[in-house]
Regions:
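Extracytoplasmic electron-transfer domains, predominantly the class I c-type cytochrome c fold
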Residues: 49-97, 207-256, 261-269, 294-316, ...
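Charged, amphipathic alpha-helical linkers/stalks
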Residues: 283-296
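Periplasmic/extracellular electron-transfer cofactor-ligation site
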Residues: 43-50, 178, 184-211, 244-247, ...
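Electrostatic cytochrome c docking/interface patches
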Residues: 61-102, 107, 111, 120, ...
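Bacterial N-terminal signal peptides that target proteins for export
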Residues: 5-15, 19-30
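Extracellular/surface-associated beta-sandwich interaction domains
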Residues: 177, 255-262, 285, 451-455, ...
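C-terminal motif of bacterial Sec signal peptides marking the signal peptidase cleavage site
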Residues: 38-41
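Autoprocessing Asn-cyclization modules and mimics
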Residues: 97-170
């Protein structure tokens, strides 16, 4: 474990080019896989991460731990820290910022010293840097201030050594954690009042908003350009930040700098991974060690025996569970940014035409796709599913109100297609992705097995609905079915 003490951090002044993650370097160097980033000078944003209701449903010993074996709350703190003391778990595919380096030359001069650093493999020095964290050697754990820094040569002047010395070969981190900490400050300033400090979608203004702000802790984001089995990509999150979500209270941050948006994206991903970690860990414990489960077990067992069994499980099995969850998070979030995850139509967009729209409406009404079941025959968002009572998939108990619910248990009205407002974007490719992958976390399913040409026909029809002289005017009742369309070149401007 090594610590990065980030002093007087402002919203973006230390980002520079510090976007090279040193996770891989940490693993090659054999350094413990946890990096603690301690922020001071941010008292205006002091806060703490909340734990989920599902964590609270566990018995106290499962939450806090037994003896030396940590429970859910302590493991969350060990791996993720709190907003003032973020911890960078090396398994997480997050761009923390900063660069790893080794000391090549160290020449002390009183309380100061001239140092030359050599960047680690695959690392790029940040253009601006104000501190160095000593990772190995006699000064390990110290944070030293830079009075001058040259990113081109790696030469620096350290000030206020206080007796600390470095030697050739010592490992240091230059401005480590600058990106994630900048993201944290920006998030607290611009996002937390709706999305909450922990990303739980329960900030102080959330109760007044419809739809509710996104709860990141599921690791699920609705509007993506990735396939139905993949998570949200960085580019998807950047697009939401830049352009907002039409028809909701999510605004556009188009005037923010690219490096600021990038920092927020990394912090949102960090919060999502923290929430997923908590959920997956609780899933391992809930069946035997929730308050409800223990109450049932007490009919035949003693509480002391149950707690003893829990202590053994936490000490012997949970470390492996934690590593497994970390590996799963790493794999799934890395995959989301891969070419394989991105939705790419196999044919160009079918030119928008009356025939294409008719074919699209045929498909919309077909038993195979059955779009009208939710969106209504005329696309007004009033299909029969809006008055049916669903069961909660977790509790298997019907919801109190009719209609469609998402994974956050929010009531979702299917989109009224006559408004022309599409929350995931109104570009043809945006609608293609909504149909291909569905809307993650909602009842809108994936139609990935539908021929891409047919998806384009549906896109053309849906985009025409707001301009129909009357609902269903492009319907097929008075018109012959449109013939199958050959793969066509993109329409002008597409």
């Amino acid at each position: 474990v090594y610590r990065l003490f980030v002093q007087s951090l402002t919203s973006s002044s230390r980002l520079g080019l510090a976007m090279k993650s040193h996770v891989a370097w940490l693993k090659r160097a054999g350094i413990a896989g946890l990096l603690s980033i301690v922020v001071s000078g941010c008292s205006d944003n002091n806060s703490s991460f909340s734990i989920s209701d599902r964590t609270r449903s566990l018995i106290p010993e499962a939450q806090t731990g037994v003896s030396e074996a940590p429970g859910v709350v302590k493991l969350l703190d060990e791996k993720f820290g709190d907003p003032q003391t973020l911890k960078a778990w090396s398994k997480l595919p997050v761009q923390w910022g900063g660069a790893s380096a080794k000391v090549e030359v160290f020449a002390a001069d009183g309380a100061d010293a001239k140092v030359k650093f050599v960047a680690g493999e695959g690392q790029t020095f940040p253009e601006k840097a104000t501190f160095v964290n000593v990772v190995t050697g006699a000064g390990a754990g110290r944070t030293l201030q830079l009075s001058s820094w040259d990113a081109a040569t790696g030469e620096a002047v350290l000030t206020g050594l206080g007796g600390a010395t470095l030697a050739a070969g010592d490992t240091c981190s230059i401005d480590g954690g600058a990106v994630i900490q900048s993201g944290r400050v920006l998030y607290m300033r611009h996002c937390s009042h709706c999305h909450g400090t922990a990303g739980d979608g329960n900030g102080p203004t959330a109760q007044y908003l419809y739809p509710r702000p996104r709860d990141y802790r599921h690791g699920v984001f609705k509007f993506t350009s990735t396939n139905d089995m993949s998570k949200v990509s960085r580019e998807d999150l950047l697009r939401v930040l830049r352009y907002g979500i039409p028809g909701t209270y999510m605004p556009s941050f188009l005037l923010m700098k690219d490096e600021e948006l990038t920092a927020i994206v990394e912090y949102v991903r960090f919060l999502s991974m923290r929430g997923e970690f908590e959920r997956k860990l609780v899933n391992e414990l809930a069946s035997d060690y929730s308050e409800e489960a223990v109450e049932s077990r007490l009919k035949d067992e003693q509480r002391a025996d149950i707690v003893g069994e829990l202590a053994k499980f936490l000490a012997e099995d949970v470390p492996g569970v934690v590593d497994g969850i970390g590996a799963e998070l790493e794999e799934s979030w890395v995959a989301a940014d891969s070419d394989e995850a991105k939705i790419v139509p196999s044919v160009p967009r079918v030119p928008d035409s009356e025939e294409s729209r008719r074919r699209g409406r045929e498909l919309y009404l077909s038993k195979t796709l059955n779009c009208a079941d939710c969106h209504g025959i005329d696309g007004a968002g009033n299909g029969p599913q809006t008055v049916a009572f669903e069961k909660n998939p977790i509790t298997n108990v019907p919801y109190d109100e009719p209609g469609l619910h998402d994974v956050w248990d929010n009531l979702n009205q299917p989109r009224n297609l006559h408004t022309g407002i599409f929350r995931g974007g109104r570009r043809p490719i945006d609608l293609f992705c909504r149909i291909h992958a569905g809307i993650k976390g909602s009842r809108m399913p994936s139609f990935k097995n539908t021929p891409h040409e047919d998806i384009w026909h549906i896109v053309n029809y849906v985009l025409s609905i707001p301009f129909e002289p009357e609902p269903g005017a492009t319907g097929v009742a008075s018109a012959p079915a449109a013939p199958a369309t050959e793969a066509a070149a993109p329409a002008a401007g597409e």
